[in-house]
Each structure stands twice: as structure tokens, then as C-alpha cells.
Design a protein with these regions (language model features):
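Short, Lys/Arg-rich flexible segments
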Residues: 1-70, 79, 83-144
């Protein structure tokens, strides 16, 4: 006595579950990360916060803060020109961080290393929301 087990290809199963590369679940995860990250980035004019949904392609697995000074703000340290030693560096002059911290305004969550701090605070919440979304997409298929 024997039996035949017919299983769909793994890529097809992933597709049904929304788990394929650049799929619905990845897009949802990216959107949740971006939404939560907005509360942590520096906010003076709002340019960093506004650039996140514009520059990020949800589903790509990357959330982008697309302003020229994003790295400088994320480091949390004052940066000066290597040669000029001034915060107002010469054109095309490389900058380096010095041991002086930046000050952030408009909320206690804003500060240096926004992604790492957001991840530490919101990781479990984001993963739970993403898991619920994936289950809704699959109509409970993975629980059967």
C-alpha cells in the first residue's frame, strides 16, 4: 500500500502566502517600519520625515531617509571638515564626526541612531502586526 503526495512548488506556496520576494508581506513590513521610524528621526523642518515614504519603495526591504544630512543626523555627533575643522566645510570637503553631541528637538523619541532605537522599542509590535497581516492574507491557510 502506498500513497502519492502532490505538493505545489515552494515558490507557488510562498506566493499564495504573500511571502515571495517583494511581495505583499514585505511591503507591509516596510510600511510599518517606515511609519514607526518617522517618530524617531530628527525633526526641524520635517524634511527627513517627509522623505521616508517618498524615497522608500515598500516591498524592497529597505527604508530610505533621502536628505543630504541624514547620516550626519543619524550619527548624533557634530561633523566638521577634515581640513577646515569647521561645521561649514568647504565644497566637496570630507567630514568627520567629533566628540560633540547634537541636540534634537520636537519629541523625546528623536535622537541619534533612530533606526536602532526604533527597532529596540517596536520590534515585537511590528513583527506581530506583520504576522497577523500574513495570516489574514493566507486566510488561515498556514494554520490548517
Amino acid at each position: 500500500m502506498g500513497f502519492i503526495l502532490r505538493v505545489k512548488p515552494i515558490k507557488e506556496i510562498y506566493g499564495v502566502l504573500g511571502l515571495e520576494e517583494k511581495g505583499k508581506v514585505q511591503a507591509f513590513l516596510d510600511e510599518r517600519v517606515a511609519t514607526n521610524l518617522m517618530k524617531y528621526v530628527s525633526f526641524k523642518s520635517g524634511a527627513q520625515q517627509k522623505s521616508i515614504p517618498i524615497a522608500s519603495k515598500y516591498g524592497s526591504g529597505r527604508v530610505i531617509i533621502n536628505v543630504p544630512y541624514a547620516r550626519f543626523q543619524a550619527e548624533g555627533k557634530v561633523m566638521v571638515g577634515v581640513k577646515s575643522r569647521s561645521a561649514w566645510a568647504w565644497k566637496n570637503e570630507k567630514k568627520e564626526a567629533i566628540n560633540k553631541r547634537l541636540t534634537y528637538h520636537n519629541g523625546s523619541l528623536r535622537g541619534a541612531h533612530p533606526f536602532e532605537r526604533m527597532k529596540a522599542d517596536k520590534r515585537d509590535s511590528i513583527l506581530n502586526q506583520t504576522a497577523k497581516f500574513a495570516r489574514r492574507l493566507s486566510d488561515g491557510w498556514c494554520n490548517k
